[in-house]
A protein has these predicted regions:
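ABC ATPase NBD coupling module
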Residues: 66-82, 112-115, 119
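Catalytic Walker B motif of ABC-type/P-loop ATPase nucleotide-binding domains
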Residues: 167-170
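Helix N-cap at the start of a conserved alpha-helix in ABC-type nucleotide-binding domains
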Residues: 178-180
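Conserved ABC ATPase signature
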Residues: 142-146, 150
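Conserved ABC ATPase "signature" region
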Residues: 113-138
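Helix-to-loop junction immediately C-terminal to a conserved catalytic motif
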Residues: 49
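H-loop/switch region of ABC-family ATPase nucleotide-binding domains
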Residues: 203-204
Length: 242
């Protein structure tokens, strides 16, 4: 469970990016975040994943206040989280399988991963996760030969093998065609349901948020102006957001 109270963030000299954002997120939820460009979506995700410090507010993760997390404590927390971006953080020359195995970096001796001496159990686990995202037949393909949607699904498998409990997906389907985007979002939704992962997913397409979000958030001017169970947004709600 994640609880955030009155999280605010500004950039000098006086540009308010986030203003008193409060929420509770429970395991198994896919929270679809929509909002205009510049509404604060990426900054919110960067704060929640401890990539950026916020100005004020309380952040509770699994019952512990982590608002002042530093150093080693922050690194330990990041083991529980994965961050997916529009352009996945993958090695293009390595195979899909080796990229997924690299997700074990935080949990295995680093030299085993880099030298390719991961165990047969590790390989089987990685293959299982590739199968889960529908890419078993692409396991030995260099990532540079995969489509944009396939790369994003490799990134999801990489997040799963490291045991991520929370996934921050920042515009993961931007630039993908509708079919490829749907496959990525199907995978994220499936992960929520089966693995009880919390997924925060920012989207440009309202129709995807309505279809896949167990909850929909609307961010406008750095404020959380809409927080509803997944359904079609009313025109009034759209007007509040956009």
């Amino acid at each position: 469970m994640i609880i955030v109270r009155n999280l605010s963030k500004s950039f000098p000299p006086d540009h308010q990016i986030l203003s008193k954002v409060s929420f509770q997120a429970d395991e198994g939820e896919l929270i679809a975040l929509v909002g205009a460009s510049g509404s604060g979506k990426t900054t919110l995700f960067r704060c929640l994943s401890l990539k950026e410090k916020w100005d004020e507010g309380q952040y509770i993760y699994e019952g512990k206040d982590i608002s002042e997390a530093r150093g080693l404590e922050k690194l330990k927390l990041r083991k529980d989280w994965a961050y997916l971006e529009e352009k996945p953080n993958l090695n293009p020359r390595k195979s899909a399988l080796k990229n997924v195995l690299s997700g074990l970096f935080l949990h295995k001796a680093w030299w085993r991963i880099l030298s390719g001496t991961t165990s047969s159990d590790d390989h089987m686990t990685a293959m299982d996760y590739l199968d889960k995202v529908g890419l078993l037949d692409k396991a030995h393909e260099p990532v540079e030969k995969l489509s944009g949607g396939e790369k994003q699904r490799v990134a999801i498998a990489k997040a799963l093998i490291r045991g991520a409990k929370v996934i921050y997906a920042d515009e993961p389907v931007s630039g993908l065609d509708p079919e490829a985007a749907s496959k990525v979002l199907d995978d994220l939704k499936d992960i929520c349901r089966k693995d009880k992962v919390i997924v925060f997913c920012s989207l440009h397409q309202v129709e995807f948020a309505e279809k896949y979000g167990s909850r929909i958030w609307g961010l406008s001017g750095g404020r959380l102006v809409v927080d509803i169970a997944g359904r079609r947004l009313t025109q009034r709600e759209k007007d509040l957001i956009f």
